[in-house]
Amino acid sequence: MSRVAIVTGGASGIGRATVELLESQGVKVAVFDRNGETPVDVSDAASVADAVDETRGRLGPIDILVNAAGIGTGGPLNGEHYVEVWERTLAVNLTAAMFMVRACLDDLVRAGNGRIVNVASTEALSAGPLTSPYTVSKHGLLGFTRSLAVDLGGQGVTANCVCPGATLTGLTEGIPAADRERFARRHIPVGRYGRPEEVAYMIVALTALEASFVNGAVIAVDGGMTARGR
């Protein structure tokens, strides 16, 4: 029987690449995204609950949850809109993952081999300038992942965290190519930005039934950037 997955943020970037790879392996995938065919606001608990119920009725119980939705934000602490940016960033990047896990939890436990993969960032492992809302949200997602691993591991559910580094997605496409190349030469040992499908490869590997002993792991997919240090 085919497994069923939900991928948040699955309409573009890393999320889209994850959807395509899961589907190529025969997994039935529902995309939760504000820009998807059926828009879902993952930062709203009621919207999440309704969408999960609809998915369950259409595809079956949920076996895999990939929380890939996220927004990149920043600004000075004393900025005029800092509080609003903070609240929105944590709502999308952290609280939404909690809503998703709660809505899917019964299915994941009942499956006996449920898989949760949270997509954070290398910002979860360090901090950059003027990115505190984003950095805090990703540190929080990493901590949430570890808590899930401890709380759910005994019920057959694994939770792991993938931390992409500089990747060619909508969050980085506005950066001039020359600036990207300069950054890559200086900070990334492999000398380039990553591709969404390279991150998706690791995400999907963690959803495999054979990955049942990988739990609470935090995996950087960053071309060696964190190993080198900034």
Question: What kind of feature is each model-predicted range?
Answer:
Residues 40-50, 83, 197-198:
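The beta1-alpha1 cofactor-binding region of Rossmann-like NAD(H)/NADP(H)-dependent oxidoreductases
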Residues 72-87, 110, 130-133, 173-174:
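Conserved mid-core segment of classical short-chain dehydrogenase/reductases
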Residues 101, 137, 145:
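Active-site helix of classical SDR
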Residues 106, 150-151, 212:
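Alpha-helical segment proximal to the catalytic Tyr-Lys
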Residues 121:
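Residue(s) in the substrate-gating loop at a strand-loop-helix junction
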Residues 126, 215-230:
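Short C-terminal tail/terminal secondary-structure segment
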Residues 153, 158, 214-216:
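Short, small/polar-rich loop/turn modules that mediate ligand/substrate recognition or access, typified
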